[in-house]
Amino acid sequence: MVHFTAEEKSVITGLWGKVNVEETGGQAVGRLLVVYPWTQRFFDSFGNMSSPSAIMGNPKVKAHGKKVLTAFGDAVKNMDNLKGTFAKLSELHCDKLHVDPENFRLLGNMIVIILASHFGGEFTPEVQAAWQKLVAGVATALAHKYH
């Protein structure tokens, strides 16, 4: 179980309030599919993913990114119960979709990269540390049903 300090919670929620979920989610999932092309196998129904520009412009990638980051918002609201918050999604990704749990860690890193690019100097090392802790906690929670 991940424990967040009051300061970490404040830093995370403060930045989250400024995040454009649709834009950030689409960019994070798109970047995941470009940087780690083997992850594309889970998204056969998404249509044209023949090039980085096709992936980044794909409306289904953007829609899924929004869905992912909306769910990530639940983590921000429930930092003290990540495992419970993601129990159903963990089961879905493990039992039905058979997603490699390592992909959750990779996606978390993509989210951090996009946040850093969007917030520049505001995304200090302290802010990054708090967010890395959160995305790692979410990845662990999503991988829970695999154990």
Curated annotation (Swiss-Prot):
On tissue specificity, the annotation reads: Red blood cells.
A Gene Ontology BP annotation from the UniProt entry: hydrogen peroxide catabolic process
> A Pfam family in this protein?
Globin
Which GO molecular function terms does the record list?
heme binding; hemoglobin alpha binding; metal ion binding; oxygen binding; oxygen carrier activity
Write the record's keywords in alphabetical order, separated by commas: Heme, Iron, Metal-binding, Oxygen transport, Phosphoprotein, Transport
* PROSITE patterns, A to Z: GLOBIN
Gene Ontology, cellular component aspect? haptoglobin-hemoglobin complex; hemoglobin complex
Please report the stretch or stretches of sequence annotated as the Globin domain.
3-147
* Amino acids binding heme b: 64, 93
Q: Does the keyword Iron apply?
A: yes
| Phosphoserine PTM sites in chain numbering | 51
Q: Which InterPro entries does this UniProt record tie to the protein? A: Globin (IPR000971), Globin-like_sf (IPR009050), Globin/Proto (IPR012292), Hemoglobin_b (IPR002337), Hemoglobin_oxygen_transport (IPR050056)
UniProt entry tagged with the keyword Oxidoreductase: no
Give the family this protein belongs to, as stated in its UniProt record.
Answer: Belongs to the globin family.
> Any idea what job this protein has?
Hemoglobin epsilon chain is a beta-type chain found in early embryos.
Name this protein carries in UniProt = Hemoglobin subunit epsilon
Q: Which organism is it from?
A: Sus scrofa
